[in-house]
């Protein structure tokens, strides 16, 4: 009897080993057969937003820095992360995609690792201008398109939905509840006239007001330093921001034709950031209003930074979305019922004088 039991267990073990081998072989065959780079170019772009050649360039640039301990090829991990960011799928759906075939824990590790690698190696794709020539190029771009001198960017915030954060000693859940009643990160960003992000700050929860985020913003600190050196450059923001020498808001209750003209041009120029958000979220549906990132703040922020890096790479290379593909940004607006001006002491006084000098230079 004991011999029969022993034989039975040996047979079961052998069968399990054979089935395990068949599964591994099938996965290998499936991965080889379903190479996403074999797709037609238009199909590839539909799924991954990048042209194949540019995708290969990124893979070749990042692969030498890959230290993740896994047998899954870097190319497959990278393309799976792109698929997740572009389509906003659940991890299990990404893992079951016919080109991936990975377990949910595996795809989870891949997404976090690859996004961190992209931010670490490619963070320079999102940066403030660092030369006089670059500033002048942006100023010229805004002036030629919208007729306002000295503008180096448009600023606003957008909300990216996340799941309810777990309670802890450092996390207060209601801090993440925004004005529309869902949990989010309030992401501050600055873009130039070509919709390229020059600054992104994803550190603040959804309940934070845009002007509160601006108070400690690295972009603000940089501009304060620039103005102390006598530089004439400013951002354009809506009336939810304070009027400062380096941040122009619309004129409250415009009385003269020049002031009305300024407000009209201001609206058109500032709309570049709204459009940039729309393009970003249309490319990367994982951070769109229709999706919710099921991650804690720190991980979700890494995904947001990765998406803005990829967005800039595409924009700089002239790879644009069609107008019909761009969705409007549906972030909850700030609680500003009428145009008013937020006073901030000396900065407000200096900002009002600087804005008036700018208004006086407008050509009708």
Label each residue range with its predicted role.
Residues 1-364:
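Short, polybasic Lys/Arg-rich linear motifs in disordered N-terminal/cytosolic regions
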């Amino acid at each position: 009897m004991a011999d029969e039991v022993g034989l039975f267990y040996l047979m079961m073990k052998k069968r399990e080993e054979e089935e395990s081998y068949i599964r591994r072989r099938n996965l290998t065959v499936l991965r080889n057969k379903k190479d996403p780079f074999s797709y037609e170019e238009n199909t590839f772009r539909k799924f991954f937003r990048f042209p194949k050649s540019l995708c290969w360039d990124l893979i070749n640039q990042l692969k030498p820095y890959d230290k993740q301990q896994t047998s899954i090829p870097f190319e497959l991990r990278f393309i799976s992360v792109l698929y997740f960011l572009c389509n906003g799928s659940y991890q299990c759906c990404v893992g079951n995609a016919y080109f991936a075939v990975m377990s949910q824990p595996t795809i989870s590790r891949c997404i976090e690792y690859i996004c961190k690698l992209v931010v670490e190696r490619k963070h320079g794709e999102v940066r403030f201008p660092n030369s006089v020539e670059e500033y002048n190029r942006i100023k010229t771009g805004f002036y030629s398109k919208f007729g306002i001198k000295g503008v180096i960017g448009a600023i606003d915030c957008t909300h990216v939905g996340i799941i309810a954060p777990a309670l802890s000693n450092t996390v207060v859940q209601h801090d993440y509840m925004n004005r529309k009643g869902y949990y989010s990160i309030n992401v501050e960003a600055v873009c130039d006239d070509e919709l390229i992000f020059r600054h992104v700050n994803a550190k603040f929860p959804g309940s934070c007001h845009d002007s509160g985020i601006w108070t400690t913003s690295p972009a603000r600190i940089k501009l304060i330093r620039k103005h102390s050196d006598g530089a004439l450059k400013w951002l354009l923001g809506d009336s939810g921001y304070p009027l400062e020498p380096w941040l122009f808001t619309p004129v409250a209750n415009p009385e003269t034709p020049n002031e009305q003209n300024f407000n009209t041009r201001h609206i058109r120029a500032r709309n570049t950031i709204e459009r940039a958000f729309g393009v970003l979220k249309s490319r990367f549906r994982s951070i769109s209003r229709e999706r919710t990132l099921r991650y804690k703040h720190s991980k979700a922020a890494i995904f947001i930074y990765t998406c803005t890096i990829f967005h800039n790479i595409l924009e700089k290379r002239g790879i644009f979305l069609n107008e019909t593909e761009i969705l409007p940004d549906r972030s909850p607006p700030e609680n500003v019922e009428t145009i008013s001006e937020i006073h901030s002491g000396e900065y407000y006084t200096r900002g009002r004088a600087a804005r008036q000098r700018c208004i006086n230079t407008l050509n009708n």
